[in-house]
A protein has these predicted regions:
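Glycine-rich phosphate/diphosphate-binding loop of Rossmann-like nucleotide-binding domains
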Residues: 1-39, 44, 228
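Structural motif
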Residues: 4, 61-62, 115, 122, ...
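Glycine-rich beta-strand-to-loop/alpha-helix junction loops that act as flexible
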Residues: 8-10, 65-73, 204, 221-223
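N-terminal small/polar loop signature for handling phosphorylated ligands or for N-terminal nucleophile
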Residues: 26-84
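Short beta->alpha linker loops
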Residues: 41-44, 94, 112, 180
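Proline/glycine-rich low-complexity loops and linkers
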Residues: 48-51, 75-164
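An accessory alpha-helical subdomain
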Residues: 138-237
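Conserved short beta-strand edge segments in small beta-sheet-based binding/regulatory domains
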Residues: 201, 237-248
């Protein structure tokens, strides 16, 4: 199952705010034996959001989307999701109950707009302030505020997607190879990549610096058995080529 993340907001792309969602998604997935396959950053542009969501809905991927589900003029995610699905946004009855429970006599039509989601959506409970997110077609839409979205994401992972936890044993291993150009290891990398499609190879070169030798961090991440076998071959071949290496 392929998992993606969409992080939305002009404030991210302009640098006014630093994204914190990407690292947290990776952390929460890895703790459950899952992995993020792709991520996309988008601004507050309804047409671009609609096109991106149409593509991701068509892919069948599981997608976590952060930001843009409010009701100010720069919030487009709810409408873009509906447009991508060829439907409309409607007030969700469970969302209405949550919003009325939150605001009581101070409930207004504007606040109820926070519960308008694409037709056919389910709500995602928000333990912080009861203003829910929504899910539809394997897509899960959260507010942009981490204090709200991260507990909501954990709820989704542990209730809606619990069957995917540790479905495959995953691991990551790497070695540090000293004073080797990447070109000298390309044949090895290509051979390992072809032999172990259940895992992904990574090569992170460093030019070194004061007190640090030039090196490459060479490793694998993916299914545990494939990682173990691939790393054994990598260590043996690096040694055969005459390069010094150390465990990461």
């Amino acid at each position: 199952m392929t998992i993606g993340a969409i992080i939305i907001g002009d404030e991210i792309l302009s640098g006014k705010r630093q994204d914190k969602h990407f690292a947290k998604v990776v952390e929460l997935l890895w703790a459950r034996g899952m992995a993020l396959d792709w991520a996309q950053y988008l601004g507050d542009d309804r047409m671009r959001l609609t096109a991106a969501l149409a593509a991701s809905f068509a892919s069948g991927d599981i997608v976590f989307s952060f930001g843009g589900i409010g009701v100010t003029p720069d919030d487009h995610t709810r409408q873009a999701a509906a447009a991508a699905l060829g439907t409309e946004i409607v007030l969700h009855p469970e969302a209405e109950r949550e919003i009325r429970g939150r605001f009581a006599d101070e409930t207004t039509p504007q606040r109820l707009m926070l519960g308008e989601f694409p037709l056919g959506s389910a709500i995602i409970p928000n333990p912080y302030n009861r203003i829910p997110g929504f899910s539809i077609r394997r897509h899960y839409f959260f507010p942009g505020f981490p204090v709200m979205s991260w507990p909501m994401l954990e709820w989704v992972l542990d209730t809606q997607l619990a069957h995917l936890h540790h479905a495959v044993a995953r691991d990551e291993q790497a070695i540090i190879v000293y004073e080797a150009p990447e070109s000298a290891l390309l044949d090895l990398m290509n051979r390992i990549t072809q032999a172990y499609p259940q895992a992904s190879l990574f090569s992170l070169p460093s030019f070194g610096g004061e007190g640090v030798r030039r090196h490459i961090e060479l490793g694998m991440r993916g299914e545990s058995a494939a990682v173990e076998q691939a790393m054994a071959e990598i260590r043996a071949e690096v040694a055969r080529l005459g390069y010094e290496w150390a465990a990461r």
